[in-house]
Design a protein with these regions (language model features):
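Membrane-interface "cap" regions at the ends of multi-pass membrane proteins
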Residues: 1-78, 397-399, 432-444
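C-terminal membrane-solvent junction of multi-pass transporters and transport-like membrane proteins
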Residues: 320-334, 368-415, 439-444
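TM-loop-TM module centered on a large, flexible mid-protein loop between adjacent transmembrane helices
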Residues: 81-82, 88, 120-125, 242-295, ...
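Membrane-interface loop-to-helix entry segments
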Residues: 46, 135-183, 196-197, 214, ...
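Loop-to-transmembrane helix boundary motifs in multi-pass membrane proteins
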Residues: 2, 7-18, 89, 133-141, ...
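Helix-loop-helix junctions that connect adjacent transmembrane segments
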Residues: 5, 47, 127-134, 163-283
Length: 444
């Protein structure tokens, strides 16, 4: 059975939703809450090295996705659809399940990060009433509201909200770059005296900030809702990846010249001390970026799950039919949205997904490595029907695959091994129930 293609009222999106979903996730929670810590710890050149290493993964992946997306129409499920139609449904479903859980947990990650924008409120309550409020007083209502909007209204309302919050994110970044501090007038920073310090902590810091760059494929999950995926996916994904990289380089410079290493490390909202009107605009920008990332994940995760159900990936037919079914009038993955939002709510109630964030990175890296491997293999063993209108180079895809796997083990070897072990178990279960499906031979 083919992947689910969402048709009806929600179909017909152009390139903009792909680009804005990706760029809002790239310039999201990690930028506002953790990037100052990264630059304060590693210095200017350490930050540049993070950008280079991260984009040795993301640029080849963006090119690989663009190549695969222009070979044939990408239906609902985005990355899952691409992988399953190249590696076969069993291996595709194995990676698809990992990808779905990463996307669903990401909703919770961004909702929890959203509550950090209310830090002044929590501090005021503690000072005024001597009461320490749990972050869930904000995160749970937000998660409930987000769930209701997506389940009842679908992608159209999500895209409209996305445009609004991305606009606010853009304003906050402009005011950040326009701001100045006393430190910036006395630092005397030049590229000649820029530092790369605490090199032993490089991969520890890299693990904290790398999830920001996993946002480059966020818009691909809207594939079934796009008017022309073969055009919108390459333009939106590559555009967001390259623009995000350029913006981060300028942010590294701005942070380095505007605040001392100590302030960068100790003040997680250091950008509010630099931006014009930062006490207001940076919390608003943080709220906008995290909310837009949560909206993006909440739109994409159900579409991955719907495509998995449409491909009969679960052992029980009733479950497949329930999850694969779209809303009658427009094909919206309403049932899959309920499941995705329920999983996200569970982690929101836990209140802390820092440890889970590393697992999320592992599964995203597995997905990126798989996409690069598919692109690489197709350069040497593809069928005559493999004729993408956009072509990457085989060695670029190979670099993306190797660096993805290497980075997994450098970030956290036990987590990397655990991710592979979980996926092997999932594959064995799927293969047991679907022995008739092709595996790797599907690519040749």
């Amino acid at each position: 059975m083919s992947g689910v293609s969402i048709k009806g009222k929600t179909s017909g999106f152009g390139t903009a939703p792909v680009f804005f979903t990706a760029i809002a996730t790239i310039l999201g929670a990690i930028l506002f809450l953790r990037f100052g810590f990264a630059i304060g710890t590693l210095g200017f050149w350490g930050g540049i090295m993070i950008i280079i290493l991260a984009h040795l993964v993301t640029i080849p992946t963006a090119l690989a996705i663009s190549e695969l997306a222009t070979n044939k129409r990408v239906e609902g499920g985005g990355e899952y659809f691409i992988i399953s139609r190249s590696f076969g449904l069993n291996i595709g479903a194995t990676i698809g399940f990992a990808l779905f859980f990463s996307q669903a947990i990401s909703i919770a990650f961004y909702v929890i990060a959203f509550t950090e924008a209310f830090e002044p409120f929590f501090n005021w309550v503690q000072t005024r009433y001597d009461v320490i409020l749990p972050r869930q007083v904000i995160s749970v209502p937000v998660m409930l509201l987000l769930s209701l909007l997506l389940i009842l209204r679908g992608a159209n309302i999500g895209i409209k909200a996305l445009y609004a919050v991305v606009s606010l994110l853009g304003v906050s970044l402009v005011l950040f770059f326009a701001g100045s501090t006393d430190y910036s007038t006395t630092t005397g920073f030049t590229l000649g005296n820029a530092q790369f310090r605490n090199t032993d902590d490089f991969f520890y810091v890299f693990a904290i900030v790398f999830p920001a760059f996993t946002g480059m494929t966020a818009g691909v999950g809207l594939s079934g809702d796009l008017k022309n995926p073969a055009r919108s996916i390459p333009m939106g994904t590559i555009g967001a990846t390259l623009i995000g990289m350029i913006v981060y380089v300028f942010i590294i410079y701005k942070l380095t010249v505007s605040a001392s290493p100590e302030d960068l490390v100790n003040n997680q909202l250091i950008m509010s001390k630099i931006a014009i009107g930062g006490a207001i605009i940076i919390p608003l920008g943080l709220a906008a970026s995290t909310l837009s990332s949560a909206i993006g994940s909440a739109m994409i995760a159900p579409r991955t799950l719907q495509a998995l159900g449409g491909d009969q990936s679960f052992p029980m037919k009733r479950v497949n039919n329930f999850l694969g079914r779209g809303r009658h009038q427009d094909g919206e993955p309403q049932n899959a949205s309920i499941v995705a939002c329920t999983i996200a709510m569970f982690f929101v109630l836990l209140g802390n997904v820092n440890a889970v964030a590393e697992v999320i990175s592992m599964f995203f890296l597995v997905t990126y490595g798989s996409l690069n491997l598919i692109s690489f293999l197709n350069h040497f063993g593809s069928s005559p029907s493999y004729r993408p209108s956009f072509k990457s180079k085989w060695y670029i895809s190979l670099i993306g695959f190797v660096v993805s796997i290497w980075v997994m083990f450098k970030i956290n070897t036990p987590y990397a091994l655990s991710a592979y072990l979980i996926m092997v178990i999932i594959y064995l279960i799927i293969n047991y129930y679907h022995k008739d499906r092709k595996g790797l031979e599907a690519i040749f």
